[in-house]
Amino acid sequence: MNEMTHRTKTRPVKVGNLTIGGNNELIIQSMTTTKTHDVEATVAEIKRLEEAGCQVVRVAVPDERAANAIADIKKQINIPLVADIHFDYRLALKAIEGGIDKVRINPGNIGRRHKVEAVVNAAKERGIPIRIGVNAGSLERHILEKYGYPTADGMVESALHHIKILEDLDFHDIIVSMKASDVNLAIEAYEKAARAFDYPLHLGITESGTLFAGTVKSAAGLGAILNKGIGNTLRISLSADPVEEVKVARELLKSFGLASNAATLISCPTCGRIEIDLISIANEVEEYISTLQVPIKVAVLGCAVNGPGEAREADIGIAGARGEGLLFRKGQVVRKVPEEIMVEELKKEIDVIAAEMAAEREKEKEKEKEKEKETQEQ
């Protein structure tokens, strides 16, 4: 059996201003729920997704009206845009012409070779990657006849077949997804895919369900896959506001230490010792830090006796007591604050630390740019 390709060993593929694969961080994606031809509504939803932390967004392109809207949408957003194409290769060509950053197709349902070749040539000319979207629910008839039902081996065979179509046309800017609604099937398919090729993998549990059930199902499946070192980009598929997909994705990546651009909340489960309204405070603080783009850890704890010690890794936190709270940094108490202002004081400290982290990150970026410049001049 081939060795599994770790996410850091996959081929880097450019998508707009991002690079997926290689040594780059996992990228969070989502998909709009609007009619793509409704530019105003689509842009408004994408703006909300951007604010929530979405890094790549996909839109359905079922008809010419949607394809013609791509250029207008692109002008008004800040993140890479992906066109989801099925059956009609001409829609892919129009989307590419409109400035799309990536095309998601299934080469098997685009039609004859000359149609696939037309899409590949257009993508190659513009430097646009193609995602091959394998789905357990829409495998080719001959694969289902061979295996009897959707299997991980059948999904990998489908992926390899489609990859070969593109490779035969000398196209290698490829990303692959192996989606299934069955968690165990998805885990097996992604693991076998990581052994079969080194293209970046887009992760997802398709049709996972409503906000609550879908979150649990996606976390179970994608968590197991991520823990194996597999995956370069992911989408949480929920029957909910797509902003919720982004929130869940950020939390999932933070749980595995795979997001350096997201804040983390640590809070205790409450008990009879608590003298403050911990649940509402934790929810308020979680909402406050939800859009921060720095890896700050914030703790909200109910017990002033054990709190600071239990959250030593937190950059900043509060531990409640009767009528007051302890404000602490890295497990060390900084000062006592009255209960009525402790949340506001915590927010002030969060702002200071977040600003420091952001400034430090900018310094690191400048250093990297200087190193690159020196390397190019040598």
Swiss-Prot record:
Top-level class of the enzyme under EC nomenclature: oxidoreductase
GO terms of biological process kind: isopentenyl diphosphate biosynthetic process, methylerythritol 4-phosphate pathway; terpenoid biosynthetic process
Cleaved signal peptide residues: none
The EC number(s) this enzyme carries: 1.17.7.3
Pfam families: GcpE
Disulfide bond entries: none
Cofactor(s) essential for the protein: [4Fe-4S] cluster
Binding site for [4Fe-4S] cluster: C268, C271, C303, E310
Catalytic activity: (2E)-4-hydroxy-3-methylbut-2-enyl diphosphate + oxidized [flavodoxin] + H2O + 2 H(+) = 2-C-methyl-D-erythritol 2,4-cyclic diphosphate + reduced [flavodoxin]
Cofactor annotation comment: Binds 1 [4Fe-4S] cluster.
InterPro entries per record: Dihydropteroate_synth-like_sf, IspG_bac, IspG_bac-typ, NO2/SO3_Rdtase_4Fe4S_sf
Region spans: Disordered: 359-378
Molecular function terms from GO: 4 iron, 4 sulfur cluster binding; 4-hydroxy-3-methylbut-2-en-1-yl diphosphate synthase activity (ferredoxin); 4-hydroxy-3-methylbut-2-enyl-diphosphate synthase activity (flavodoxin); iron ion binding
Domain of life of the organism encoding this protein: Bacteria
Keywords, sorted A to Z: 4Fe-4S, Iron, Iron-sulfur, Isoprene biosynthesis, Metal-binding, Oxidoreductase
Pathway listed: Isoprenoid biosynthesis; isopentenyl diphosphate biosynthesis via DXP pathway; isopentenyl diphosphate from 1-deoxy-D-xylulose 5-phosphate: step 5/6
NCBIfam families: ispG_gcpE, PRK00366.1
Family statement drawn from the similarity comment of this UniProt entry: Belongs to the IspG family.
The protein's role, per its UniProt record: Converts 2C-methyl-D-erythritol 2,4-cyclodiphosphate (ME-2,4cPP) into 1-hydroxy-2-methyl-2-(E)-butenyl 4-diphosphate.
Name listed for the protein in its UniProt record: 4-hydroxy-3-methylbut-2-en-1-yl diphosphate synthase (flavodoxin)
